Amino acid sequence: MEQTVPVRGRKKSWTGKVVSDKMDKACVIAVERRVQHPVYKKYFKKTTRLMVHDENNEAGVGDLVRVVECRPLSKRKSCRLAEIVEKAK
């Protein structure tokens, strides 16, 4: 008999800018998204701040980074740094 293994989906990923790197092995990124107002239909920006696990303290303030979700690492951290897309100037 052949057993079938359920296929899991891909993990979510976000791209954002580092706004704080003052913690050890962690940083905070801001992810912007465009949302449409339900009544007036105008688009506006909303910002979400994510706390990210940065094992080697690679990211600095102003860097553009890509993060992926992972298991909860602490009360507020459930993402880890995947790559630094662009370093700050």
Swiss-Prot record:
Keyword Ribonucleoprotein tagged: yes
Recorded GO MF terms: rRNA binding; structural constituent of ribosome
Keywords: Ribonucleoprotein, Ribosomal protein, RNA-binding, rRNA-binding
Domain of life of the native organism: Bacteria
Listed GO biological process terms: translation
Keyword RNA-binding: yes
Cross-referenced InterPro entries: NA-bd_OB-fold (IPR012340), Ribosomal_uS17 (IPR000266), Ribosomal_uS17_bact/chlr (IPR019984), Ribosomal_uS17_CS (IPR019979)
UniProt GO cellular component terms: cytosolic small ribosomal subunit
Its job: One of the primary rRNA binding proteins, it binds specifically to the 5'-end of 16S ribosomal RNA.
Record HAMAP family: Ribosomal_uS17_B
Quaternary organization: Part of the 30S ribosomal subunit.
Family membership: Belongs to the universal ribosomal protein uS17 family.
Record's protein name: Small ribosomal subunit protein uS17
Lineage, top ranks: Bacteria, Pseudomonadati, Chlorobiota, Chlorobiia, Chlorobiales
Gene (name only): rpsQ
